[in-house]
Amino acid sequence: AIEVFVNGQAVPGAISRCSYIRVDSGQDESSAHLACLLPGLSANDEIELKSYKATQNRVAVNMETASLYVERVADTRNVFSGTATEAVGGSMLNLREEEVEAGELALVWNSDRTGDAFGHSGETITLKDKGSYLVLVNVPLQGNVIRASVGLQLWLGGYEEGDIAIGGRAQQGFIRNVSNHDKSSIHFSGLITTTEANQDLVVETLQLAATGEITMGDKEASIYIEKVNDQSGLFFSTAETL
């Protein structure tokens, strides 16, 4: 696992635990990825990225080349940032869509920064302007469920008339529940484009494999959204085939 610390304190929503290695059928490599905003920093704060063992497996794991990019996000930039500890329906994240009412799987955000391009109420983030938005989401997972898998999807435009944003899925939240592997995480980084002003965005989790209780444990999810200039200096594409 990797986690970000500022002045020795763990940053809420800044953890990645999806680097599972099975050591079977040639699967002996993995990686952890994280992209988030560190709000409220002061001059001379110290940022650390720590890597630590997340299971009881005694096989040594060696690191290849890691990379780190840090950028100051000025107050003038139009961004939304927040954290979450549960969904509308509660802390349980491992539920199928057909088991619940529309909206119950959506994560409830506590905002720590809301720019002029955004509105916010609970689980709903309103993208006020038509255009493109960079979206980063991190969701920690914990639970004693054998072969559990929790996914994430970005729902754009409301439940009645909207749909999943193009490319708006993440599905790396696998939990083996062997050798103390009871933690994982889901991560999304991508660009979404609105076709009209004032479209609502919600982030949902959903069950993809075994049934059982999966929550965030004692950690938090995080989200970062920034309105980007899609008229110049930007490339974005989608793919459906190899």
What are these regions (language model features)?
Residues 1, 56-148, 172, 213-242:
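Terminal (often C-terminal
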Residues 1-10, 147-160:
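Short, surface-exposed beta-strand/strand-loop-strand elements in extracellular ectodomains
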Residues 1, 32-36, 44-53, 131-141, ...:
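Extracellular beta-strand-rich recognition modules
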Residues 36-42, 60, 124-126, 190-196, ...:
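Exposed beta-sheet edge/beta-hairpin loop segments within beta-rich domains
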Residues 12-42, 118, 156, 161-196:
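Glycine-rich strand-loop-strand elements at beta-sheet edges
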Residues 6, 12, 41-46, 126-127, ...:
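Glycine-biased low-complexity/repetitive sequence motifs
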Residues 10, 53-56, 208-210, 231:
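Acidic glycine-/aspartate-rich tracts in secreted/extracellular proteins
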